[in-house]
Amino acid sequence: MVKITVSESNSKNLNVAYIYNSMTRYLSICGADADITFDDSRTNLVMTAENRFHSYLRKFTEERVAESVSIGYKYALFQKNIRPSGLSETDREVLLCALVSADFDEDKRYVAERLKDIRVYSIDGFFNFRLQALKEKWAGIIDCIPCCFTERDLKDFLDYILSEREPSSVHFKDGELYDADYVRLKRAALIDGGLDDFSIVREVLLSGATEVECLTNPPPVLCDVLKKYFGSRTAFRFS
């Protein structure tokens, strides 16, 4: 049997919850067991499977750990340090999520590559001691954000990001967001703090999609953001 362990400080244990919830499909395929345990300072996810599934489970575990760093840790750093004047709290959230998603794929690949020789995935320790270049890159982004950022600037920034991406779409239905294969997206679960009712907007922005199809009526906060920043890239397909 092979054992794969993911560990995180209790203050960031939403990362472990995200990884577990995102891995249930693969765990089921392998017939693997998974347990979440807690002690005074840490939350641990322990997955056990037959040896033949080792590389399979490691691959998806490393992808999910990389996502937790490239979204959760990055957002926390940006939320703390990026506070330009000129934006409402809603628009600031849009800016933060847009910055996180702008080079998400690149960040995720970088993190995943450095996880290859890790035996126990201690996320906070790995971030603090093995990702110095990535932290310096993120600090450089923070330094580039002007002290004043207008709604027009934000619109131009979103237009630029969306125009540079390969076309892709997501689908909103009954309060949830789905990718092109109708797999439910849950990346916003990696974000702690911020506006309480903003989760579905974060999900759209973090998806990296260039188009949004609404199959049911979206909540007002999402509707406003889509009309303001996605415009014709949004399709409302409900009566």
Residue ranges of predicted features:
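C-terminal structured domains
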Residues: 181-239
